[in-house]
Amino acid sequence: SFYTGYPRFKFKDEELIPKGKIISVPQLVTPFMFLERYSLWPYRKLRDQFSFLSHQHLDVTVSKNIVEPIILISFCAAGLHSFRKNKKLGGINICDKGSTHIEYQNEIMKEEYLRYGMYPREIYQRRIDKELREYHEADFITVPSKFVYDSFIKKGISKEKLKLIQYGARI
């Protein structure tokens, strides 16, 4: 099955995944995306908390529906509970991370804010904590570039756990 926080209509033209396999869990992601799209967040902290909760909601929903061992691929910050359930059943867990190691990312952002004399906006701590646990509990972490790969190595993640899968295609 393919679980998503996006509403079902976003997949109306999807041809590669059978319609019956797409399970939409939009209760928190849809309002989050609406507020994000139109910059309607009154406070950054509220945005960060809502984002964390939307990932958490999807994660818990998926975990409740795992009944046998599977190969589970989850975007980072949305798989910890599912990983734990799947691991108990003997499954394989893959954390898909499209950007650098969360601590590395936070450090670079902080440096850049300070470089330009701005107040640093750090990543929401609960997200950092959850991602770090996911890195530890995942069997593999997929990353899209050598730069991202190297950020994980610098933060102590083993080469054996990392899988470099570059985005794009050669046509």
Locations of the language-model features?
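Membrane-proximal helix-turn-helix segments that form the acceptor-binding/catalytic region
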Residues: 59-69, 80-82, 88-89, 101, ...
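An aromatic- and histidine-rich active-site surface loop
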Residues: 8-12, 54-63, 71-109
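Short beta-strand scaffold positions
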Residues: 73-77, 143-144, 164
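Acceptor-binding helix/loop patch of EC 2.4 sugar-transfer enzymes
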Residues: 32-49, 92-129
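Generic beta-sheet signal
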Residues: 2-5, 96, 144, 165
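A conserved catalytic-core segment of Leloir-type glycosyltransferases
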Residues: 4-57
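Carbohydrate-associated surface elements
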Residues: 147, 168
